[in-house]
């Protein structure tokens, strides 16, 4: 047998994967800090006790207790809920279910969350971008002009990394523009910090609306990797065709069900109250730093701030063990750093470090 024209492992891989730049998660970027304010996590751990002892059995595909608890919490029917390995899997499922590689596209509006782009590129689906306007609101005309061939439109509200809500009237206009043309995915990962802004009540009006949620932020369970997709039953049934047979392990489902109990939800709301209080303390302290240009309003558990010399500020705090998220490479975010709201002690360390920075 001939061994001519043999291919390397890299040659055997798909071309788009060879060229792919992976999403740079906070943990992937590393660092040796002791104050981690770069991943929008809750700053302290929540304790749970496992109640299920059936690890010899495969778990349910869609654990009933988790689905029912989340449906009650979100104000929707259980048939309108899908649980997955974080909201990131929900992004991937939407693209896999609705986009033909090499034919269809997704559309998103930077600056925004990076996994929309990475998921599409991994699957081989084209990406279209319509940058937001100067106030980080939707460019509706630009979206309309680029809708042809776009099957899924991703909108993050509150937006990561800018922290602001998308104008609800603009969201309604977007849903009307896309009716019969594309699915609209509203990423509500941070909605617990502004629950009045959820679009869950709109599902009955818009069959093409899909909402992503997570337990990673206000529920303080980033390490659990548990997210939710809210949509009309027809959409959920399509997603069930492409999701893995066992997306949640038994321990994950056990803890998620506890977190979504009345007691767990009350605890989450108390955490939100504390974070909002600490967010204001952090903002007040930042405004006294000479190196600060502007701190932007936020509806989330993080703030975005522009500095006169953000690269040196980022490195200086990094060297002091304070790890922030550099947003310089995002469109329209030159000079910006994103800071997760931490504990009072962590926030004060940030404030003190920034006050010591030169102009």
Swiss-Prot record:
Cofactor(s) of this protein: pyridoxal 5'-phosphate
Reaction equation(s) it catalyzes: L-histidinol phosphate + 2-oxoglutarate = 3-(imidazol-4-yl)-2-oxopropyl phosphate + L-glutamate
Annotated EC: 2.6.1.9
Alphabetical keyword list: Amino-acid biosynthesis, Aminotransferase, Histidine biosynthesis, Pyridoxal phosphate, Transferase
Annotated GO MF terms: histidinol-phosphate transaminase activity; pyridoxal phosphate binding
InterPro entries (alphabetical): Aminotrans_II_pyridoxalP_BS, Aminotransferase_I/II_large, HisP_aminotrans, PyrdxlP-dep_Trfase, PyrdxlP-dep_Trfase_major, PyrdxlP-dep_Trfase_small
Enzyme class per UniProt: transferase
Source species, domain of life: Bacteria
Assembly notes: Homodimer.
The protein's name in its UniProt record: Histidinol-phosphate aminotransferase
Species, as recorded: Salmonella arizonae (strain ATCC BAA-731 / CDC346-86 / RSK2980)
């Amino acid at each position: 047998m001939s061994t001519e024209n043999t291919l390397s492992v890299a040659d055997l891989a798909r071309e788009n994967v060879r060229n792919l730049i992976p999403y740079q998660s906070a943990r992937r970027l590393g660092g040796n800090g002791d104050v981690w304010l770069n991943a929008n996590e809750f700053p302290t751990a929540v304790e749970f006790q496992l109640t299920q002892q059936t690890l010899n059995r495969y778990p349910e595909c869609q654990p009933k207790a988790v689905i029912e608890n989340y449906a009650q919490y979100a104000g929707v029917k259980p048939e309108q809920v899908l649980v997955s390995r974080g909201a990131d899997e929900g992004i991937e499922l939407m693209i896999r279910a609705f986009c033909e590689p090499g034919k269809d596209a997704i559309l998103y509006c930077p600056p925004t969350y990076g996994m929309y782009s990475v998921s599409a590129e991994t699957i081989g689906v084209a990406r279209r971008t319509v940058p937001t306007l100067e106030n980080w609101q939707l460019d509706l005309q630009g979206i309309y002009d680029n809708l042809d061939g776009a099957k899924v439109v991703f909108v993050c509200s509150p937006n990561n990394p800018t922290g602001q809500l998308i104008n609800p009237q603009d969201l309604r206009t977007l849903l009307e523009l896309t009716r019969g043309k594309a699915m609209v995915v509203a990423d509500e990962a941070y909605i617990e910090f502004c629950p009045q802004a959820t679009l869950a009540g709109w599902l009955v009006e818009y069959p093409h609306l899909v909402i992503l949620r997570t337990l990673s932020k206000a529920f303080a369970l980033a390490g659990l990797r548990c997210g939710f997709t809210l949509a009309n039953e027809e959409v959920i049934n399509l997603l069930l065709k492409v999701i893995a047979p066992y997306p949640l392990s038994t321990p994950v489902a056990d803890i998620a069900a506890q977190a979504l109990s009345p007691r767990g939800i009350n605890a989450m709301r108390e955490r939100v109250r504390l974070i909002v209080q600490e967010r204001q303390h952090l903002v007040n302290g930042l405004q006294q730093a000479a190196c600060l240009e502007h701190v932007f309003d936020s509806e989330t558990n993080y703030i975005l701030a522009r500095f006169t010399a953000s690269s040196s500020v980022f490195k200086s705090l990094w060297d002091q063990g304070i790890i922030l998220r550099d947003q310089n490479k995002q469109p329209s975010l030159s000079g910006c750093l994103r800071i997760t709201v931490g504990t009072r002690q962590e926030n004060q360390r940030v404030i003190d470090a920034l006050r010591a920075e030169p102009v």
